[in-house]
A protein has these predicted regions:
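Pocket-lining segment of extracytoplasmic ligand-binding domains
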Residues: 1-58
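An extracytoplasmic/periplasmic, membrane-proximal ligand-sensing/linker region
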Residues: 57-115
Length: 115
């Protein structure tokens, strides 16, 4: 598991995916940014509320058990970005920069949205 290997290497949490917005878009169109945020949050909420139905709709086509998918979509995947995860992401960028995989370390700046 990639996350377990990352934890062994760095002692930090791993971020697998993010929703990102261009900072010009975020500053020039805050209402649209809020709308996108609200829709994404709603989709996550709906997905978690209907997790059983979602699993049942795909289980016949997957090589996993119901319990495995339930665990994966439940406590295994974290749906929030805490300071611990941001710290892990910064470490990822720092290591990628040291290995010349990226030219510069990106700034992580969270957009202002109503939660």
């Amino acid at each position: 598991d990639l996350g377990a290997e990352w934890k062994k290497l760095t002692g930090k949490k791993m971020v697998y995916a993010l929703w990102v917005a261009n900072k010009n878009f975020a500053s020039e169109q805050p209402e649209m940014l809020q709308l996108v945020y609200d829709r994404i949050r709603h989709a996550f909420t709906q997905g978690l509320q209907h997790k059983k139905a979602a699993i049942e709709s795909v289980i016949k086509d997957k090589p996993f058990t119901y319990a495995q998918l339930d665990e994966y979509l439940g406590p295994t995947i974290r749906w929030n970005l805490t300071d611990d995860y941001i710290d892990g992401l910064k470490t990822f960028y720092e290591l990628a920069h040291k290995m010349n995989l990226i030219e510069h370390i990106p700034e992580i700046k969270l957009a202002a949205v109503k939660r």
